[in-house]
């Protein structure tokens, strides 16, 4: 970099190796953080001089008015200017720190528009993570917790995945009985809609082979009618009433700290938590007060918290640029990854299984009317085409009876669509939020849908073809949250084994990048303050070791995140 005499003492030039490996690079430029970092609400620019400038970068701005740039300036928590290296260098004064990016790539901060961040964080602290590749490993992990737990007390595992086990079969209650004959145990699927309960847990709940399935749930049985221990959807309610809360307020705060560290390490700068109660709201506030919340949050209230907010006159959008109230969350059917979503045609190999509904049409109408008339954006979990139709019926009804411009109601997951559904979504101005890492990560599950359905599942290309602002969604823990994996998944439609699912739904890298940034901001009414590297917007950005355009599409997920910056401050950096 040519030194600027005016600020030569503040110039920084780094080789790629040094930039990646040194924590002093951006820290020296005024964007490093102390051990506990506080995200603050936006402050106005106080002077023309930028705090620091980043030069000689490959900036993918995701701003249609200026798609690429070489450099940008940051003042406070905002982008002060974006342009060529020469122009941005000329803005620097003697107090401005100068960073030479040496040709590395910069993107806007990534946004996850559907995640369960706080719950995932605290689960890591209080439950047994069984994201393992064999039943033997799962049993060993559970055994350690059982050994430390008094007889009769519950043991809980989470993040179980039935299709990634070396034994080639799912976990069942008899496996768990072998290591926990005297403790009730539940192992939750990472999809969040099923769990495997051992025999003691079933007995405590009074569940036998003769227990009928509820309309909105299922107790699974083998071919001989014997309970396997797998329980789906609302059939789990009987257990929820028995399992005591196992987390403290401090653990929930620490869970937010942990998950925000993990997610910013992956390049996420904003998350929309779909579904949260009072404890989640307190956890985010506590973590923020402690300086331990590294990303921006939009919380989707549900249940009693939603009722309390309505009674207090709060609506979607209340809050600031760090934490705000988002849409209200409801859930109307089963899971794509657990193969319980409600469809108009059956699952492959299960001719009588169409999936599970968890809300009736009347219940959806009632919930949507209440939320819509109280000024809330709405996000309803609806995976299957049957359920999506039901949700659209409700959205169309309320907009006909009580029109509200630009309501941006959402369909969370919106997994299986059709041309008719796409036309209705477009006409209603609804935002779909399909899984963005599912095709790549959950490939072994798609055989139960088949290629015909997969041509219309997680249909990012079709949404874009219909000019629908499709949002980015991991649903973590059900799907991995890493946005670079999301880019790869949407671009290639390949699973871990290289199988292609629904190749007609492939999109370009630039389209995928926009989904993960600008479309994410649009989904929460924040497109004017973030989602692109644009003058005046929040300085949320990510520095990548390589440009996704330059690597093999099958290797995008392996690109190194060098640094994640939120509001001008470094939240992750080597």
Model-derived regions, located:
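N-terminal secretory signal peptides
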Residues: 1-18, 25-29
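Divalent metal-binding segments
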Residues: 22, 26-30, 42-55, 60, ...
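Signal peptide processing junction and immediate N-terminal pro/mature segment
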Residues: 35-43
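Acidic (Asp/Glu)-rich catalytic clusters
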Residues: 288, 316-319, 426-427
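Non-cysteine beta-strand/loop elements that form the S-adenosyl-L-methionine
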Residues: 323-339, 430-438
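His/Asp/Glu-enriched, well-ordered alpha-helical/loop segment
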Residues: 368-379, 383-409, 413-414, 419-423, ...
């Amino acid at each position: 970099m040519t030194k600027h005499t005016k600020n030569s003492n503040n110039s920084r030039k780094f080789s790629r190796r040094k930039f990646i490996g040194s924590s002093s690079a951006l820290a020296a430029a005024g964007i490093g953080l102390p051990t506990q970092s506080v995200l603050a609400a936006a402050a106005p620019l106080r002077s023309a001089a930028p705090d620091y400038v980043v030069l000689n970068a490959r900036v993918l701005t995701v701003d249609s008015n200026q798609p690429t740039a070489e450099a940008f300036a940051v003042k406070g928590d905002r982008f002060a200017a974006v342009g060529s290296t020469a122009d941005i260098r000329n803005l620097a004064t003697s107090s401005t720190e100068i960073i030479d990016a040496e040709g590395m790539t910069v993107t806007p901060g990534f946004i996850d528009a559907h995640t369960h961040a706080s719950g995932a964080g605290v689960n890591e602290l209080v439950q047994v993570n069984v994201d393992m590749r064999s039943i033997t490993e799962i049993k060993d992990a559970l055994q350690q917790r059982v050994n430390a737990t008094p007889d009769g007390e519950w043991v809980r595992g989470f993040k179980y995945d039935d299709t990634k086990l070396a034994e080639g079969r799912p976990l069942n209650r008899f496996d768990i009985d072998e290591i926990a004959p005297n403790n009730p145990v539940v192992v939750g699927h990472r999809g969040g809609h099923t769990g495997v309960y051992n025999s003691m847990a079933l007995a405590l709940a009074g569940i036998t082979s003769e227990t009928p399935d509820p309309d909105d749930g299922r107790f699974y049985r083998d071919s001989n009618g014997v309970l396997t221990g797998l329980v789906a959807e609302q059939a789990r309610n009987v257990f929820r009433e028995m399992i005591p809360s196992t987390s403290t307020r401090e653990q929930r705060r620490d869970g937010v700290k942990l998950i925000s560290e993990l997610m910013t390490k992956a390049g996420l700068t904003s998350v929309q938590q779909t579904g949260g109660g009072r404890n989640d709201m307190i956890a985010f506030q506590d973590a923020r007060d402690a300086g331990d919340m590294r990303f921006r949050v939009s919380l989707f209230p549900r249940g009693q918290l939603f009722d309390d907010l309505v009674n207090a006159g709060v609506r979607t959008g209340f809050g600031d640029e760090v934490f705000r109230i988002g849409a209200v969350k409801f859930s109307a059917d089963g899971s794509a990854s657990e193969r319980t979503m409600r469809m108009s045609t059956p699952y492959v190999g299960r001719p009588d299984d169409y999936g599970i509904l968890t809300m009736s049409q009347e219940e959806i109408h009632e919930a949507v009317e209440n939320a819509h008339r109280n000024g809330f954006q709405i996000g309803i979990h609806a995976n299957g085409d049957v359920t999506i139709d039901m949700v659209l019926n409700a959205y169309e009804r309320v907009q006909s009876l009580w029109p509200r411009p630009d309501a941006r109601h959402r369909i969370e997951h919106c997994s299986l669509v059709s041309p008719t559904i796409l036309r209705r979504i477009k006409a209603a101005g609804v935002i779909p939020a399909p899984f963005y890492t599912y095709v790549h990560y959950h490939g072994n599950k798609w055989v139960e849908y088949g290629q015909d359905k997969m041509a219309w599942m997680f249909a990012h290309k079709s949404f874009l073809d219909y000019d629908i602002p499709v949002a980015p969604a991991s649903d973590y823990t059900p799907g991995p949250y890493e946005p670079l994996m999301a880019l790869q998944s949407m671009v290639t439609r390949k699973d871990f084994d290289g199988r292609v699912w629904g190749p007609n739904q492939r999109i370009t890298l630039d389209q995928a990048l926009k989904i993960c940034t600008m479309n994410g901001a649009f989904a929460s009414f924040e497109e004017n303050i973030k989602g692109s590297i644009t003058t005046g917007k929040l300085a949320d950005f990510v520095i990548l070791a390589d440009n996704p355009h330059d690597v093999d599409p099958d290797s995008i997920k392996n690109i190194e995140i060098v640094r994640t910056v939120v509001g001008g401050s470094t939240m992750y950096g080597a």
